[in-house]
Amino acid sequence: MMPSSLPRQGGAERLRIIRIYLCTTLILLLAYGIWYAGVWPGPLGQDGYSLIANINQSAPRYTGKDPAWLLYALATYGLSQRVEVLVLPLLLLQVAALARIIGWIYVRRYPITATALLLLVACTPHVLNYGSSLYPDAVFSLAFVALLFEIWLILGHRRLSTWSIAWLAILFPAACYFKANGIIILLPMLYLAIRLKTTSRWVIVAIVLSWSAAIQWGGTVANLGHGHGALRPLILFETTNFMQTRPMNLWETRHMVTDRTKEIMHRYISQEDIDSLYDRDYWDTLWHLNQDRVRFREMSRIDFRHLRSDFFTYNLWRNIPAFTASRINIFLASALAQGGMVGPDNARHGLAGVTTLSTYNPFNLSSLPNTLNEIYETSYNWRFVLWSPFVGIILVLLVFKRALQERHLDELVISSTLLLQLGGIFLFSIAAEYRYLLAFFYAPLLLFPIRFIQQNRDPLPCQKCPRSRSTRQPVTSTP
C-alpha cells in the first residue's frame, strides 16, 4: 500500500506517508471488521446459496458463474467448508485496495477529498454489505477500478516499481476474470504494455498470460464450463419480450418475430408461459426458476444458432422500441437500486438450507447485528442519493471529454474503458441488479484523482489548442 519510492523522501516526509497509510488501513480494517463480525459469515443471497449447494454436490459448473470465481470458491470454501474462509481474504483485498487509493490522495494533501471518499464510498453500508457477501461483484468492481488506478499511475511515470508490479499481479485476476465483462480490462493492460519500455512491457505480458493460462487450465481440469455468457441470456430474454401477446392485436404487430423463432421458442416454452413468466426486470423466471415449464437450458446448439441469427437479422430490428425500452428500464431500475437486495442478516436463514461448517453469529453478539440492520435499512431508504452511481458516470464523461479536448491518450484509454463497461452493462444486463453498477459507485476513487489531482501529464501535441491549455505543471507523485 505504501509508495515504492519512500527512500527518496526526507525522513519527516517518509514518516508522514507511513502514518497516513497505516491510519487509513487501520480505519478501514476497523470498519470492515466490525461490520463482518455483525454479519458473520456474510450474506449468501441466491447466488451464494447456489454456489455452496453446487460445490457441496461437486457440481460447481451448474452455478453458471465464471471459472475464475469458481476456482477461488473451490480453493477456499471447497477445501474448508466454511463461508468465512471464502469471504475474509476478499475483505482484506478490498481494505488494501481502498487504503492504497485513499491514502495516496491524502498523501497529496487532499484530506477533505480523501475523507469524503472514505465515508461516502469505502465505508457506506451497502458497500460493506456487498463486500462481505458471497457475490463477486464488490471485489470485482473495486479490483477493476483499482487496477485502472495503478495503470494510470504507471503511465504517469512510464516505469514499473516493485509495488506496482505486485498490485498489477494481485488485482488482475479479480478485475479481469471474476465476471465476464472484466475482459475489457485487457485493453488498458495492452495499452500499458505498449507505452512501457521493453523489460517492463514483458512484465505486463507475463502477468496477463500467466494468470490467463492458469485460470484456463484450472477451469478445464475442474470442468467448470464457461458460465452462461452475456449473449445467450440477452437473446432469450429479449426474444421472450418480443413475443409478448399484444392485447390490441393490431395487424402491424402480428409478425414481430420470424416464424422460425416462434417454432424454436415454443419447443421450450409455451405462449401462455411466455406471457405469464416474463418479468421486465429479471430473467430469473426464465432460467433459474420454473425449470419444469421453461426448458431453455435444454436448447440445442442448432436451435440457439438459428435463434441468434434471427435475432440479429430480423427480430431485433423489428422491435427497436421494445428493445430500447427494455434496456433503459433495466438500467434505471439497477441504478436506482429497485431490484432485489440481500440484507446483512441474510445468513441467519440462508445457512439453514445448505450443509456447511459455518454458523451465523458465532460470537453471540446481541446488539451489533440488529444495529447493522438498522443502519443498512436507513441507508436503503436514502439509496437514490447515497447509493447513486451517477456521480461516477458523470465523472467518467467529464474525464473523457477533457481527454478528447486535450488529446491526452492515457486519460482517454482509462475513461474509454469505463465507458465500454457502462455500454456493456446497458446493452447486456438481463436483471435489474444494483451490484452490476458498483464499479461506477467506486469510480470516484479513480476519477477524482484524474480530474482534480494533477499527475505528471504528457498530452499529445494539439496545434489548435493554446499551449497553456494542454500543458500543466506536474506534481511530484509516486505510484
Language model feature labels by segment:
Residues 81-85, 89, 323-415:
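Membrane-interface anchor segments at the N-terminal boundary of transmembrane helices
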Residues 56, 139-157, 167-172, 188-189, ...:
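Specific aromatic-rich, kink-prone transmembrane helix
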Residues 129-139, 178:
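Short acidic/glycine- and proline-prone juxtamembrane loop motifs at membrane-interface regions
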Residues 88-108, 142, 146, 150:
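Transmembrane-helix motifs of polytopic, lipid-linked glycan transferases
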Residues 226-359:
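Membrane-proximal stem/loop segments at transmembrane-domain junctions that anchor or position
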Residues 164-179, 207-214:
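Membrane-interface alpha helices of multi-pass inner-membrane proteins
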Residues 67-71, 79-99, 130:
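Loop-to-helix entry region of an early transmembrane alpha helix in multi-pass inner-membrane enzymes
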Residues 37-51, 60-72, 80-84, 304, ...:
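Extracytoplasmic catalytic/substrate-binding loops of multi-pass membrane glycan-assembly enzymes
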